[in-house]
């Protein structure tokens, strides 16, 4: 059995509609492993100006001004992604970006994240700080400019924060561990969809202790066909409507997938995961060191259901022209 005092993190990622959720569901069938519902992706770390970017900024940036603005950005992003407002919470509904992470993390995402970020503050002082206008509302900027015009500029002074840069990795992982315990206090392993993208895993490997990554690749013909199906539903997948745009986007993304030699990284093909399931399952078990964990059959992973997502493109003859284009331009990525 795994040591429940040693937390393992698994990131399962792909190129969009890659079938990664099936792999995450399989991983979640092992004893002591937490995995999310398909509707939950924790983007707070990976998005532009998210926590990974902020931690890199804090570790490497010399300019205190840039660090201060980055700090204020990440506080705002955390609030917007974390708040789970009631219908009567006007401020929360105004700012919310709809991820509602507080709901998923036992109502503690905002508390834990703010406690972590504010614990990094070493000192602060007040000063005129026009650079903050780039991250505040136009209305607030207008009011400040008006106050300056009528010689009330002292009211526009901002808090400028000086941050502590020591032991950042230790502090980050202590915070992350606290977050994980709010998902499930009894699990020893936590699997996420898209904690990091597959293009540059260096930030994931640099900041998260005891982490492994699985990148799931899928035949682009099936991705395109699946996207077209979604485009006819309320879950339209942005950017896949046009075959030319799809080819350009897929080629750019697929060519950028991290394929460096690293024992923390495993690349699997979705079609092989389905058609040669037992062998691929063994690869995953060995990679994650799950040999001694019990596999619990559940409705979470359903091989027969997942198998319906192989050769999807063959069911749509009306896409033949587009499929031929994909076969020509993306021949190196076909399964």
What spans do the regions from the language model cover?
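PAPS-dependent sulfotransferase catalytic core
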Residues: 1-166, 302-303
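A polyampholytic, Gly/Pro-enriched intrinsically disordered region
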Residues: 55-66, 234-246, 312-322
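PAPS-dependent sulfotransferase catalytic domain
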Residues: 111-294
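Low-complexity, flexible helical/coil segments
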Residues: 46-51, 69-77, 225-231, 248-259, ...
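Short, solvent-exposed coil/turn elements at secondary-structure transition points
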Residues: 39-41, 219, 271-273, 299-302
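Generic structural "secondary-structure junction" signal
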Residues: 44, 225-226, 275, 313-315
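PAPS-dependent sulfotransferases, especially Golgi type II membrane carbohydrate sulfotransferases
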Residues: 1-11, 125-132, 237, 251, ...
């Amino acid at each position: 059995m795994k040591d429940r005092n040693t937390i393992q993190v698994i990131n399962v990622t792909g190129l969009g509609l890659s079938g990664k959720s099936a792999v995450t569901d399989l991983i979640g069938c092992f004893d002591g492993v937490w995995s999310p519902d398909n509707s939950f992706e924790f983007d707070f770390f990976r998005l532009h100006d998210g926590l990974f970017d902020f931690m890199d900024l804090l570790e490497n940036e010399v300019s205190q001004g840039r660090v201060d603005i980055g700090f204020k950005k990440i506080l705002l992003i955390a609030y917007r992604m974390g708040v789970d407002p009631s219908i009567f919470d006007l401020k929360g509904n105004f700012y919310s970006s709809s991820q509602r992470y507080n709901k998923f993390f036992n109502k503690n995402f905002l508390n834990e994240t703010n406690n972590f970020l504010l614990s990094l503050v070493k000192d602060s002082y007040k000063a005129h700080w026009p650079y903050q206008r780039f991250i505040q509302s136009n209305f607030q900027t207008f009011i400040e400019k008006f106050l300056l015009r009528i010689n009330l500029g002292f009211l526009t002074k901002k808090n400028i924060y000086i941050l502590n840069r020591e032991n950042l990795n230790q502090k980050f992982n202590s915070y992350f561990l606290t977050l994980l315990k709010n998902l499930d206090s009894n699990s020893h392993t936590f699997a996420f969809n898209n904690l990091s993208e597959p293009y540059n895993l260096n930030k994931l490997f640099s900041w998260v202790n005891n982490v492994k990554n699985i990148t799931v690749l899928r035949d682009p013909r099936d991705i395109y066909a699946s996207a077209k199906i979604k485009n006819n539903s309320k879950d339209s997948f942005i950017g896949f409507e046009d075959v030319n745009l799809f080819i350009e986007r897929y080629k750019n993304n697929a060519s950028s997938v991290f394929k460096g030699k690293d024992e923390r990284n495993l690349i699997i093909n979705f079609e092989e995961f389905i058609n040669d399931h037992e062998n691929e399952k063994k690869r995953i078990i060995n990679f994650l060191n799950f040999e001694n964990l019990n596999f619990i059959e559940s409705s979470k992973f359903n091989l027969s259901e997942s198998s319906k997502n192989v050769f999807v493109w063959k069911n749509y003859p009306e896409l033949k022209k587009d499929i031929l284009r994909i076969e020509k331009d993306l021949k190196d990525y076909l399964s």
